């Protein structure tokens, strides 16, 4: 492949989500012309609300910031690799306790403007109906909402039906419609500032709320069988959690542990704590820079919009909530990547074609960015006649790309960043936080040889 004279001297990136945006930037910054193809607004998807690049359709959070957490380690790796998408997230961060969350409108608009102004980036607003010609270096980053025509061509090329699951997004409410006489500001265990709004429930309120969720009418989903619906376990609809058992929500998004309203009394008084602590707590996270919009954390849902209003207004503090956006559910498509891709994210049967992002079977925003970084970097290297690179599997980014290219395929499912993907440490460390810190230290050290390959301007 290196020095292949048939390779075109430019790159095409299909899809301007998180992965495609990062891939296009890496190609352009390597001095290679890149065409970024995005079907919005010519063709809308069921989940997007704008035509801007890298729109966050589920949560506005990239996950934990701390580098001794899996998501935080991946973010730090990407910062060190010169990721535009993560750097811009840092620039547009909103308060979210120990997490990296962004003002999603300003964030996407900023990334769109940056790419639009780059002299080597050509943006084409159109639907790509099929894969480009064989000798074109192409990054497939069309995401979980790949259009049907392109998905059909992809099935013909791979000889495989796509895998899929159903994903959902949480509702968003106006902050000034939240009753802070009932709700309170705090972060769990008082970590960071009081960045969340918390709506406490007693047992009777929780049980009535769960019953309402179970009885509420769901929206009809197109093109799928209700009985065989597959959900991603990391983004289950709240009504699905309610169905799984009385306490499932209380050990998930509604867990009350570590949350205390000072108006209840002294948290250090055991009797007060036992008498006053909440049975369950609904949390809302700031959605925009100005704190006017708040999303219900973990409240992905497929309820009809009228039912969402009725049921969610049962939550203490949200009786008069004004909804900016209701929750929606959509089908997510991904490749059976272990049968198709190498750790370089090249297709094994077509080396000029690379894939990145959620379509490869990684889960989470930072994971999509990591795939975009690697695919874009390797696309540029192919055009320049250089060997593509694979990231060390001791890094979180490398562990994810090795997983999607090597995992057993009996039941391949999307995978988020997690320390279980990393090879064992040389010595066993019993303390979990210390162990995760050791994983981090090894990862960042092993990333240094890769950083040496990156042009200096990208590392600034």
Swiss-Prot record:
GO BP field: tRNA methylation; tRNA wobble uridine modification
Record's subcellular location: Cytoplasm
EC class of the enzyme, as a word: transferase
Enzyme Commission numbers on file: 2.1.1.74
Protein keywords: Cytoplasm, FAD, Flavoprotein, Methyltransferase, NAD, NADP, Transferase, tRNA processing
Catalytic reaction annotation: uridine(54) in tRNA + (6R)-5,10-methylene-5,6,7,8-tetrahydrofolate + NADH + H(+) = 5-methyluridine(54) in tRNA + (6S)-5,6,7,8-tetrahydrofolate + NAD(+); uridine(54) in tRNA + (6R)-5,10-methylene-5,6,7,8-tetrahydrofolate + NADPH + H(+) = 5-methyluridine(54) in tRNA + (6S)-5,6,7,8-tetrahydrofolate + NADP(+)
This protein's record includes keyword Methyltransferase: yes
Cofactor: FAD
GO molecular function, one term: flavin adenine dinucleotide binding
Primary location recorded for the protein, binned into one broad class: cytoplasm
Pfam families in the record: GIDA
Record-level GO cellular component terms: cytosol
Residue ranges of coiled coil: none
Sequence positions that bind FAD: 15-20
Described purpose of this protein according to its UniProt entry: Catalyzes the folate-dependent formation of 5-methyl-uridine at position 54 (M-5-U54) in all tRNAs.
Family under the similarity heading: Belongs to the MnmG family. TrmFO subfamily.
PANTHER family linked: GLUCOSE INHIBITED DIVISION PROTEIN A, METHYLENETETRAHYDROFOLATE--TRNA-(URACIL-5-)-METHYLTRANSFERASE TRMFO
Protein name from the UniProt record: Methylenetetrahydrofolate--tRNA-(uracil-5-)-methyltransferase TrmFO
């Amino acid at each position: 492949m290196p020095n292949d004279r048939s390779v075109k001297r430019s790159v095409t990136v299909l899809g301007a989500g998180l992965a495609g945006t990062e891939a296009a930037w890496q190609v352009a910054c390597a001095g290679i012309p890149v065409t970024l193809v995005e079907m919005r607004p010519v063709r809308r998807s069921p989940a997007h609300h704008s035509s801007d690049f890298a729109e966050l359709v589920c949560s506005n959070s990239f996950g934990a910031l701390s580098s001794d957490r899996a998501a935080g380690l991946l973010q730090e790796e990407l910062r060190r690799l010169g990721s535009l998408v993560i750097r811009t997230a840092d620039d547009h961060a909103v308060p979210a306790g120990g997490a990296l969350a962004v003002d999603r409108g300003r964030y996407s608009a900023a990334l769109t403007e940056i790419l639009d102004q780059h002299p080597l980036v050509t943006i084409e607003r159109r639907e790509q109906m099929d894969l480009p010609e064989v000798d074109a270096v192409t990054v497939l980053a069309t995401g979980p909402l790949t259009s049907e025509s392109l998905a059909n061509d992809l099935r013909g090329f791979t000889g495989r039906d796509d895998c899929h699951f159903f994903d959902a997004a949480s509702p968003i409410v106006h902050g000034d419609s939240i009753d802070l006489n009932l709700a309170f500001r705090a972060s769990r265990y008082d970590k960071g500032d009081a960045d969340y709004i918390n709506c406490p429930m007693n047992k009777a309120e929780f049980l009535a709320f769960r019953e309402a969720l179970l009885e509420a009418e769901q929206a009809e989903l197109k093109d799928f069988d209700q009985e065989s619906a597959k959900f991603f376990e990391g983004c289950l609809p709240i009504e699905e959690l309610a169905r799984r058992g009385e306490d499932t929500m209380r050990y998930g998004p509604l867990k009350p542990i570590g949350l205390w309203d000072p108006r209840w009394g002294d948290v250090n008084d055991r009797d007060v704590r036992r008498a006053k602590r909440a049975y369950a707590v609904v949390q809302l996270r700031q959605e925009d820079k100005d704190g006017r919009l708040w999303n219900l954390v973990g409240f992905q849902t497929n309820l009809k919009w009228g039912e969402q209003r009725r049921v969610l207004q049962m939550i203490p503090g949200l009786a008069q909530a004004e909804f900016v956006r209701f929750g929606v559910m959509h089908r997510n498509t991904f490749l059976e990547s272990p049968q198709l891709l190498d750790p370089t994210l090249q297709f094994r049967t077509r080396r000029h074609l690379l894939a990145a992002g959620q379509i490869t079977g990684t889960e989470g925003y930072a994971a999509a960015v990591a795939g975009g970084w690697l695919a874009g970097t390797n696309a540029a290297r192919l055009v320049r006649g250089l060997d593509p690179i694979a990231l060390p599997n001791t890094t979180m980014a490398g562990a994810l790309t090795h997983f999607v290219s090597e995992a057993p395929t009996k039941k391949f499912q999307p995978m988020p960043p997690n320390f279980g993907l990393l090879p064992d440490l040389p010595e066993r460390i019993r303390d979990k936080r210390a162990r995760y810190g050791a994983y981090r230290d090894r990862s960042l050290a092993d990333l240094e040889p890769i950083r040496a390959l990156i042009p200096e301007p990208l590392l600034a």
